[in-house]
Amino acid sequence: MKYLILSLVANLLVFGVLSAIGLNINILAAMMIVLVIPIMISGIVFFKTNIDKTYIFFNIIFIDFYYYIYNVHLMTLPKFNNYIKTEMMELEHIDVLITSKDFGFDEILFFTLYLLLILIVLYYLKKQLKNKT
């Protein structure tokens, strides 16, 4: 249980730092941090815990919640619309569609499936490592 709490607090800190940085970061860097750092924290701590399925469930729920709050926070910032326009001009050669005030179910579903897939792979990897020892 302590590892579950450790993971949730560490991920909360990551999203807290990202919220504090706000719009002072490149949008691609923010996307990569959101996709990579929380799953790295969860994956590393996952190998320490004994409550695998509970750990996976609560991590997905809380990371989705943190992600949602982070995005809502960014969209309510006064400079958000100008930030999106500027970033889209810089990303003209990369096919990324980012619109203002358009955060919804499909993003949460993608993020949930992404986390679930990686944590299931880690679950089976952990299971195989236990069987070898």
From Swiss-Prot:
Top-rank taxon: Bacteria
GO cellular component terms, A-Z: plasma membrane
Subcellular location: Cell membrane
Regions crossing the membrane: 3-23, 27-47, 55-75, 103-123
Key words of the record: Cell membrane, Membrane, Transmembrane, Transmembrane helix
Main location: membrane
Membrane topology: Multi-pass membrane protein
Job description of the protein: Accessory element involved in the expression of sarA and several virulence factors. Modulates SarA production and/or function in a strain-dependent manner. Affects the transcription of the accessory gene regulator (agr) and genes encoding virulence factors including alpha toxin (hla) and protein A (spa).
Name of the protein in question: Protein msa
Native source organism of the sequence: Staphylococcus aureus (strain MRSA252)
